[in-house]
Swiss-Prot record:
It comes from Physalaemus fuscomaculatus. Coiled coil: none annotated. Expressed by the skin glands. The keyword Glycosyltransferase does not apply. The lineage of its organism: Eukaryota, Metazoa, Chordata, Craniata, Vertebrata. It is found in: Secreted. This is Physalaemin. One of its GO terms (cellular component) is extracellular region. The modification Methionine amide is found at residue 11. Belongs to the tachykinin family. InterPro entries: Tachy_Neuro_lke_CS (IPR013055). Disulfide bonds: none annotated.
Amino acid sequence: QADPNKFYGLM
């Protein structure tokens, strides 16, 4: 379950 929040952290 990939959370969108994690993606934001990469940004």
